[in-house]
């Protein structure tokens, strides 16, 4: 297991020729396999295109063990281990908002060449490093959508019950 960052970097060859018919770079969706959601991927992709972000991350205002921090322009500026833990800022923010990452990203292929990490690594490490360098890693607010973590058997069983 290479974690999300290591796995994506290993598959980078697949995205090397990412130019569409228009000759413009074609972003792709990266979606954690253990997530079930109704998040509008087309709206998310459209926001990504409109803002020319390097990456756009689906986030929600919900309880989690780790939070990503975003500034007033919805740009990634840090992370926090828990809601009551001190923030770890990688760039200044007047007011950092803590949102839970949903494991769904829209990524511009140019990100792949910027990933300097090797081996097993979280893509969040790349995002934080790139945000510190001024790259645009944006939040897509997805509070109005359903989202479930299916990483535990009991969560899968509950989702099956709810979908009946």
Stretches with model-predicted labels:
Residues 68-70, 139:
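A structural signal for short hydrophobic beta-strand segments in well-ordered beta-sheet cores
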Residues 51-61:
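A short, conserved acidic/glycine-rich loop-to-beta-strand motif
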Residues 21, 25-29, 36-37, 41-49, ...:
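Catalytic-core segments of class I nucleotidyltransferases/pyrophosphorylases
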């Amino acid at each position: 297991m290479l974690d999300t960052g290591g796995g994506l970097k290993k598959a980078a060859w697949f995205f090397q020729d990412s130019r569409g018919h228009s000759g413009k770079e074609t972003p792709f969706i990266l979606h954690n396999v253990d997530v079930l959601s109704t998040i509008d991927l087309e709206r998310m992709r459209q926001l990504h295109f409109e803002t020319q972000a390097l990456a756009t991350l689906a986030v929600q205002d919900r309880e989690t063990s780790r939070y990503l921090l975003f500034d007033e322009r919805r740009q990634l500026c840090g992370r926090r281990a828990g809601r009551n833990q001190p923030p770890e800022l990688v760039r200044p923010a007047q007011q950092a908002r803590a949102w839970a990452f949903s494991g769904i990203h829209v990524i511009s292929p140019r990100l792949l060449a910027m990933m300097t990490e090797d081996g097993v690594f979280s893509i969040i490490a790349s995002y934080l490093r790139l945000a510190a360098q001024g790259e645009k890693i944006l939040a897509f607010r997805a509070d109005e959508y359903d989202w479930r973590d299916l990483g535990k058997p009991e969560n899968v069983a509950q989702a099956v019950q709810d979908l009946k």
